[in-house]
């Protein structure tokens, strides 16, 4: 049900005041444009998504001289707009500043809030899908439309050849899990929930009369504990789940059953499980889950919380690289994240003169802690960060960036968790005044392996990464006796991720395509390269369903990229105006990044 919050701000008696209304027929807000000037916010407009398609909003106010600030919301990754803080000044007769908050991060303050009155647009448990308000010379007032947040449903892993069951998703949390295991696998599962603040006893799904071993797991509601993922093991021959490994946000893992069979994962970007569904009869044949969003797990800033705030957000899978600029103290820090399979590098926040890198072996390695030193406060109670050191899940420690001067130590760490996003403050001197982080439990090891690239000499290295679910489509461009260009489209979190161009597309006379079905995956790549040109001259792909045509020149291979019982989920290599080398990332059959 849609809920409308009335517009707040300045009520004007001017005849020229214009009221506007974008309506509530949207799925999400995707981008916000705010245009400000010396006298406040002059105009604002919003982009939406409706029925899965983009919809541009109208400009409200005067789009004339001034500056425009934007804030994008990645609805494809489950991000949505939760609330708005706005500031108005009756003396200057208009809105002066505005700030937006999603379920993952907070925008910078757009405008100036000095000596202003603040109001907030927010409804607990709901998201914003539309705006309305009024304007004259400035934006005068703002209101919003809200709707309840729908849970994410992950389909069952396993077989569907028995009785279907569904506990639903109208719960606040899981309370207790009970599993009966036997020699043939999991015989039944029973889950109790918290609904409307009260305990709801679940039903038995499977066969409760058999012999076996009973295992139980309780979720500690008083400590705000919740399930973040389930790792399961499924036997194709018996069509029965053999084991279930449950993981909570407090890093309390419980294994029920056996680690036998094909591995699968039920997870949704750090969200919490609020319900299960599946198929069962004489045993548990499959399992799926419902997820709801959670409040970000946030480690507060250490240091001086004065200056300009910045917030990378927490909607990332992990950190791939750290950049630190330092001559004596820490002048700047920024990060390269994995955002749903795409590399996202945070922007420069100041000029850098001595930037150094710390590279992680992601997705097999995560940042687990940051140790820092703060300068001794001055007479004006001012401090800043002197040094930073990063530690990883593989036991590695980065070099210490910054100054070796003594100061107050601090640590950003949550036991058993990975740091997946950062926030902080920049001081008037544009050095780092404070640093905080977002964390989530370290995901199960994906067992990603990197098979070295094969081919000739030359070219610059590239790497699409290996955290995708599968390959969707391949483009191959052929030049003069050589493969001149390749490009890969991948599946990640049920959406298509477009890889970068590798090689020279414009020099390729023929552009060929190889399209895979949604349940098809690549198991090997064979090819040929020419020692004289250093370029690859032929490629052929084999999937679990078919072999592709020969792309290029010739049919005799001199290299093969393959690992038994694994599937290819990403590519790397070298290229210039042609493709010189090609390598792959592989994961065990049955494992998927969710």
UniProtKB/Swiss-Prot annotation:
Coiled coil: none
Superkingdom of origin organism: Eukaryota
Alphabetized SUPFAM superfamilies for the sequence: Mannose-binding lectins
GO MF annotation list: carbohydrate binding
Record bears the keyword Transmembrane helix: no
Domain Jacalin-type lectin span(s) in chain numbering: 2-148, 151-293, 296-441, 448-588
Keyword rRNA processing: no
Keywords: Lectin, Repeat
Name the record gives this protein: Jacalin-related lectin 44
Family that this chain belongs to: Belongs to the jacalin lectin family.
Species for this entry: Arabidopsis thaliana (Mouse-ear cress)
UniProt gene name: JAL44
């Amino acid at each position: 049900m849609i809920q409308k919050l009335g517009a707040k701000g300045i009520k004007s008696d001017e005849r020229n005041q214009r009221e506007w209304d974008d309506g509530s027929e949207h799925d999400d807000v995707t981008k916000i444009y705010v245009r400000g000037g010396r006298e406040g916010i002059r105009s604002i407009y919003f982009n939406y998504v409706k029925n899965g398609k983009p919809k541009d909003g109208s400009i409200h106010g005067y789009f004339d001289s001034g500056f425009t600030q934007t804030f994008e919301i990645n609805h494809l990754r489950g991000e949505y707009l939760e609330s708005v803080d706005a500031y108005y000044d009756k003396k200057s007769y208009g809105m002066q500043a505005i700030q937006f908050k999603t379920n993952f991060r907070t925008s910078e303050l757009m405008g100036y809030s000095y000596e202003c009155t603040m109001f907030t647009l927010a409804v607990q448990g709901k998201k914003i899908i539309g705006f309305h308000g009024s304007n004259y010379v400035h934006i005068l007032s703002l209101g919003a439309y809200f709707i309840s947040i729908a849970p994410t449903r992950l389909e069952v892993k396993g077989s569907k050849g028995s009785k279907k069951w569904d506990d639903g998703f109208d719960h606040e949390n899981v309370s207790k899990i009970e599993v009966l295991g036997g020699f043939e696998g999991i015989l039944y599962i029973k889950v109790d929930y918290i609904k409307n603040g009260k305990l709801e006893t679940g039903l038995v799904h499977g066969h409760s009369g058999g012999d076996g071993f009973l295992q139980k797991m309780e979720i500690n509601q008083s400590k705000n504990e919740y399930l973040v993922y389930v790792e399961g093991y499924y036997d194709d021959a018996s069509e029965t789940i053999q084991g279930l490994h449950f993981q909570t946000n407090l890093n309390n893992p419980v294994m029920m059953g056996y680690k036998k069979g094909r591995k699968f994962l039920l997870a949704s970007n750090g969200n919490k499980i609020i319900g299960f569904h599946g198929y069962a009869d004489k045993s548990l044949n499959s399992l799926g889950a419902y997820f709801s969003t959670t409040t970000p797990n946030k480690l507060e800033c250490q240091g001086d919380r004065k200056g300009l705030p910045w917030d990378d957000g927490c909607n990332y899978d992990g950190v791939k690289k750290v950049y630190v600029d330092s001559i004596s103290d820490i002048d700047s820090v920024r990060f390269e994240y994995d955002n749903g399979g795409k590399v996202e590098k945070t922007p420069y926040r100041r000029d850098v003169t001595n930037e150094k890198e710390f590279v992680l072996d992601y997705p097999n390695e995560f940042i687990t802690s940051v140790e820092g030193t703060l300068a001794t406060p001055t007479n004006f109670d001012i401090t800043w960060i002197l040094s930073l050191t990063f530690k990883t899940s593989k036991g590695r420690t980065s070099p210490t960036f910054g100054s070796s001067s003594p100061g107050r130590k601090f640590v950003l760490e949550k036991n058993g968790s990975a740091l997946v996003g950062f926030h902080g403050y920049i001081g008037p001197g544009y050095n780092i005044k404070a640093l905080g982080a977002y964390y989530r439990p370290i995901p199960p090891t994906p067992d990603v392996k990197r098979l070295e690239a094969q081919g000739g000499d030359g070219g610059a290295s590239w790497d699409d990464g290996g955290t995708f679910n599968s390959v969707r489509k391949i483009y191959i461009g052929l030049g003069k006796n050589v493969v001149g260009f390749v490009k890969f489209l991948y599946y990640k979190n049920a959406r298509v991720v477009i890889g970068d161009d590798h090689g020279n597309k414009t020099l390729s006379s023929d552009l060929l395509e190889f399209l895979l079905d949604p349940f098809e995956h690549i198991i090997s790549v064979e090819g040929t390269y020419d020692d004289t040109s250093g370029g690859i001259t032929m490629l052929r792909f084999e999937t679990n369903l078919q072999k592709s045509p020969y792309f290029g020149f010739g049919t005799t291979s001199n290299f093969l990229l393959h690992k038994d019982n694994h599937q290819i989920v990403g590519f790397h290599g070298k290229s210039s105006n042609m493709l010189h080398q090609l390598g792959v990332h592989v994961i065990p059959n049955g494992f998927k990044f969710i």
